[in-house]
Amino acid sequence: LDKPNRLQVKETTFNTYDYKLFGEIKGVDDYFDLIDALNYASPDDEFIIRIHSGGGSLGTADVIINAIQNTPARVHGYIESLCGSASTIIFLSCHTYSISPRAEFFVHTASSGTIGKEHENYASIMFDRKRVHKMIRDAYEGLLTEQEIDDVLKGQDYYFDAEELGERLEAYTEFQQKKFEAELEAFQKEQEDALDCGVKPKK
């Protein structure tokens, strides 16, 4: 008698993307290739974003971060050498991360300039201040202490070498995992409460 086939083979097709985020982060149109690849990726695809950048445009960083957070693919951030300012927020938005032995990581608040009438400048500055403060708190929560985040918002710069950054990333990963579990538990409870009340749960 023929023996049953115990081996099943599943053929899969996936892509691995290796992207170099080097130099100053400039206009968003310089990153359409990365953004489009993330937007059209499949769950089996993988991205490696290699970073050597002192930062740049927060607006462009925002668009890249949105693409990373919304892609079904897995995105790994790797610091080749320098990672500062806006590029640190991109790095921390990746799903996993690693660093080279010579990695440098620095954090500071945003800088900007405005041209126009005094009352227009004031309104613009206050709006940007509120937006940037929220971005900094969201990005570095778990990596920096609350006091360190407050210091950054007051103008303090922080610099970490590979050893200290590695230790902080371990704590940051644990913090993010606990945060995810708490949010998932709260969502599940909300769904259960909705069902108990006879209300259609959210999708």
Regions found by a protein language model. Give the residues of each.
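Intrinsically disordered, low-complexity segments enriched in small/flexible residues
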Residues: L1-R6, E185-K203
